[in-house]
Amino acid sequence: MLKEFREQRINEIKQISAKGVNPYPYKFEKTHSSQDIKAQFENLNPGEVKEDASVSTAGRIMSLRHHGKSAFFHIKDFFGRIQAYIRQDIVGKDVYEFFKEHIAIGDIVGVKGSVFKSKTGEVTILVKEIELLNKPLRPMPEKWHGIKDKEVLYRQRYVDMIANDETLNRFRIRFEIIKLIREFLNSKGFIEVETPILEYVTGGASARPFITHLNVFDIDMYMRIATELYLKRFIVGGFEKVYELGKNFRNEGLSYKHHPEFTSIEIYQAYADYEDMMNLTEELFVFIVEKLFGTTKVKYQDIEIDFSRPWRRVKMRDFIKEHLGVDILEDTEEKMLEVLKQHDVEVEIKDKGHLIEKLWDLVEDKVVQPTFLLEHPVEISPLAKKHREDPRVTERFELIIYGREMANAFSELNDPVDQYERFLRQAKLREAGDEEAQMMDKDFVRALEYGMPPTGGLGIGIDRLVMLLTNSPTIRDVIAFPLVRPISFEEEEMNLEGGSQE
């Protein structure tokens, strides 16, 4: 069926060309978006025509209803949909006959005309000129919204965006969030910088890296798992407020909140500590939410998330003790293992840091409203400064919302001797088989030896933030072109032919 449709369309395009019409023109002068037109003419009365108005817009035809020598159709552009009305007595017989014979749902067209409000109160373009801008070779997926196999949507996100306004809007919001983050930080005097994606030594997080090969030097390199260590080199060099927003790569599994290629932002401020980063985090999130929604309250999965300041603060030690009855600072590793066993948690690496992280995993989903989780033990915070009052823990926080880590921040460790010793401990974990332990980065230690001022650092997961603010249940819904298990193009085509859109 798809093959026959394509052949029919190819023949139709030849017919259109034979009539002297270019089915793929080079340009169209679009002066108004659908949103512009509706906003400008919303105050018209039903039935009122604004003859002296002149608009020019373009988009994809999403619906089409013929009525003899006239037709109504809806055009969809990036900002929404708008109705258009075409009549033979206005555009002329030849133009209307061409429209009737060759223009169909899915075609991209440009229209020019005046504006009126229909009797039902819908702002409508009265078409005076129309131009075919593209005739697709594939049919529009009328039942695309009913697909049960979401991997089809992920593989062909472009069609998902065409068919589902909510998908297009979700990504519009995503990039609006990114724009707002930059606007906020730039207004605070932060400078956006760039750091390497290919690294000789990777670090800044506990994760398994991707390995690639650089032919010119004939060496293996790593794709970055975080931007932290190079951003702190900027601070050493004399920058005082920096950030980088970009992709990181971790060779790990897929889940509703994990994706091997993901977007994050890291922010560093000299002469600041983690208290300053908490204030900055609250201020940034409230700025974004209020700009997007005009309120500090957001609905996520039927739960109202309230971003009103100040946010709750709780120590990791206290929270785990409250819910599991184990003290991560005082109790033995045997006691921690016993508690984990009671909850059917298998532990491959019995290092104390891993045990603490496994314990936290058991209780993380109990945090719903924005909460700063404070004072992580030194064992799981190799880049954070020891707490000024209790050296067993660090000046670190994670922002937890709806049971998910949204941000991670420290008073940054700037003692090169302490940093070297912590890298040594991480190196021993790697030797013991922990592929996520951090690598020894001697150049970073050397940078610290030149002196880094007291610094506060903050990292925010952009994808999880977008999930929260678009009410999306899984991370792949907010990544435009996420990873899916590869199948052949032919198999994909067979799936479409077989009615996977039903």
Curated annotation (Swiss-Prot):
CDD domains: LysRS_core (cd00775), LysRS_N (cd04322). GO terms for cellular component: cytosol. Mg(2+) 2 binds at E405. Binds 3 Mg(2+) ions per subunit. InterPro entries: Aa-tRNA-synt_II (IPR004364), aa-tRNA-synth_II (IPR006195), aa-tRNA-synth_II/BPL/LPL (IPR045864), Lys-tRNA-ligase_II (IPR002313), Lys-tRNA-ligase_II_bac/euk (IPR034762), Lys-tRNA-ligase_II_N (IPR044136), Lys-tRNA-synth_II_C (IPR018149), NA-bd_OB-fold (IPR012340). GO terms for biological process: lysyl-tRNA aminoacylation. The keyword Kinase does not apply. Mg(2+) 1 binds at E398, E405. Its cofactor is Mg(2+). It comes from the Bacteria. Keywords: Aminoacyl-tRNA synthetase, ATP-binding, Cytoplasm, Ligase, Magnesium, Metal-binding, Nucleotide-binding, Protein biosynthesis. It catalyses: tRNA(Lys) + L-lysine + ATP = L-lysyl-tRNA(Lys) + AMP + diphosphate. It is an enzyme of class 6 (ligase). Its EC number is 6.1.1.6. One of its GO terms (molecular function) is magnesium ion binding. It is found in: Cytoplasm. Homodimer. Belongs to the class-II aminoacyl-tRNA synthetase family. HAMAP family: Lys_tRNA_synth_class2. This is Lysine--tRNA ligase. The lineage of its organism: Bacteria, Thermotogati, Thermotogota, Thermotogae, Thermotogales.
